[in-house]
Regions:
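Hydrophobic transmembrane alpha-helices and their immediate junctions
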Residues: 179, 397, 411-454
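Transmembrane signal-anchor hairpin modules in multi-pass inner-membrane enzymes, especially those
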Residues: 1-129, 165-175, 239-251, 289, ...
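Aromatic-anchored transmembrane helix interface
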Residues: 82-92, 114-121, 135-162, 172, ...
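Alpha-helical transmembrane segments of multi-pass inner-membrane proteins
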Residues: 2-26, 44-50, 121-124, 151-159, ...
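Juxtamembrane membrane-water interface segments that cap and precede transmembrane helices
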Residues: 73, 202-220, 390-408
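Transmembrane alpha-helices of multi-pass inner-membrane enzymes
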Residues: 235, 277, 289, 420-430, ...
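Long extracytoplasmic/lumenal interhelical loops at the membrane interface
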Residues: 339-354, 358-412, 431, 435-438
Length: 510
């Protein structure tokens, strides 16, 4: 054991030295070019490296931290390796190293993970039938990066399902995810104004486009408000949350989250602001607060809907958030969401669905593959089609179908979509069981409630968003750590059988 530790220390020291030399040379060249953005990223990499070294056997914590972020890191040609991809790659290397040192078990958990393995088989078949190169994680046909992302998602699942999480780890993960969402949202907003080429906010399709659009950088606001709102509701019961001791900070924070979400223009996120308290209240059996919350929600929505256009005028982004309710909404908001000439239908998503169905009918079992033909993209840019049609075709080429199930079916076949459906079902069942089993067990319970809400969001959002490759990046790690928690709680329960009851330690849920 001492020899293994000494060898590991030597390997780490050599790796740090070589990495530091390479980083110093690269930073010098960037400084000479005046590339401040890259220098900032290098500084962040140094801080992250120190953080990873100090984690030691808790190296896996870089996964939830990195996956909660969505920032560009290392430039690779004309592409960027995201913080999510970098975090999983680093964790995978450390995982393999620990396996080689006989310090790390591997737990496949086939009873729970079989849908993931079948999904991977469908992905492998798709890649075999339509292989693409791996240059810069994308090749000139643009699709290999998606296959790499799916492989990374599986690696994150495997690592997290093999660990033994403790209560302090779950607390750290929740708080780190909040900071990660805050940093990502802040980066997206700043990038919109300073680095528009590096943000997804500038490419979001909208029928209403002008210099000061009400649905551009505003979208990033819900990335912060919804997780913070859910975190506050998950860490303590409503009875304690609304007590005299906490009401002076809890109510203002919850109201602020509602306002920020309204200003984001995200209708689905606003719906979650009312659904998540319902889920948490039912889980805790706080039926009185459930009734009071329903009355309060009805009052707030009535004031906003009935007062709009009569007593006050809401910001356009807030109107977009509430536009599905009957009210006097601005015509520009209606034009950007309903199309006006299509009887309240979303023209954009309807067209995307029709295109996906065409591919599914032609190739129902294997899909068209996760690839983009460069010649087709150039031809698309050179056509005289309308801007909306170009946007739709470009997003479809990149597998951004705005419908997870149709997208998976079109990309890698209907069987893959069926297996992913089973995965989502097991994911939901797992976190329901975790909520029941971890009831009033401090951060185990808070984490389970928080992630249960996120799982419900994944499922409900699947018909308006999702992606064949990025959805596994978002969801599989949550499944992996959920299985690890479930196994840990089951083991603890078995150990406690037949033993006398001991006094419970302080819990955040009391």
């Amino acid at each position: 054991m001492q020899l293994q530790n000494l060898t590991l220390q030597k390997i780490t020291a050599v790796g740090i030295f070589l990495g530091g030399c390479a980083l110093a040379v690269y930073a010098s060249s960037m400084a000479a070019e005046g590339n401040m953005r890259t220098l900032i990223l290098i500084f962040a990499a140094i801080v992250g490296g120190i953080f990873i070294i100090n984690l030691k056997e808790n190296f896996w914590l870089i996964l939830p931290v990195g996956l909660s972020l969505n920032l560009p890191t290392i430039p690779l040609g004309f592409r960027q390796i995201s913080s999510q991809e970098l975090a999983i790659t680093l964790a995978t290397l450390l995982f393999i190293l620990r396996i080689a040192m006989h310090n790390q078990p591997i737990k496949l958990r086939p009873i729970w993970s079989w849908p993931i393995f079948f999904y991977l088989a469908c992905v492998a078949l798709s890649f075999t039938l339509r292989p693409v190169g791996l240059w810069a994680f994308g090749s000139n046909s643009g699709g290999a990066r998606f296959y790499v992302q799916i492989a990374l998602a599986f690696s994150a699942f495997l690592i997290l399902s093999s660990i033994v999480p403790k209560e302090r780890h779950l607390k750290f993960i929740l708080i780190a995810c909040l900071f990660g969402n805050l940093l990502t949202a802040g980066w997206n907003v700043l990038s919109y104004f300073l680095f528009p080429a590096f943000t997804w906010l500038t490419t979001t399709p909208t029928a209403f486009a002008e210099e000061e659009s009400f649905y551009t950088w505003h979208q990033a606001l819900s990335q912060v408000s919804l997780p913070v709102y859910t975190f506050i509701l998950a860490i303590m019961p409503f009875q304690r949350l609304l007590s005299v001791k906490n009401i002076f900070w809890s109510i203002p924070c919850l109201i602020a989250c509602l306002v920020v979400t309204a200003l984001s223009g995200k209708r689905a996120a606003m719906a979650m602001m009312f659904l998540f308290p319902l889920i948490i209240a039912l889980a805790r059996k706080e039926y009185l607060y459930l009734l009071l919350g329903g009355i309060l929600a009805s009052v707030l929505l009535s004031i906003a809907v009935l007062g709009q256009g009569r007593l006050f005028v809401l910001p356009l982004a807030a109107q977009r958030t509430l536009v599905n309710l009957p009210g006097q909404w601005d015509t520009r908001v209606l034009a950007s969401t309903t199309g006006l000439d299509r009887e309240e239908k979303d023209v954009f998503r309807t067209a995307m669905k029709e295109k996906a169905w065409q591919i599914i009918k032609d190739k129902p079992f294997t899909g068209r593959g996760l690839s983009i033909d460069l010649k087709e993209m150039v031809a698309l840019i050179q056509t005289n089609q309308g801007e909306d049609k170009k946007t739709m075709d470009a997003l479809a080429s990149g597998s951004s179908w705005h419908h997870k199930w149709l997208g998976i079916s079109a990309d890698i076949g209907v069987p893959a979509a069926v297996f992913y459906g089973f995965f989502n079902l097991l994911l939901l069942i797992l976190y329901i069981l975790l909520v029941v089993r971890s009831c009033n067990q401090g951060w185990f319970y808070a984490f389970s409630l928080f992630q249960l809400c996120m799982v419900v969001k994944f499922i409900l959002f699947s018909t308006t968003g999702g992606h064949t490759a990025t959805s596994p990046m978002d969801e599989w790690w949550i499944y992996g750590i959920g299985l690890a928690i479930f196994s840990s709680l089951s083991s603890a329960k078995d150990l406690n059988k037949g033993q006398p009851d001991l006094p419970k330690t302080a819990s955040i849920n009391r």
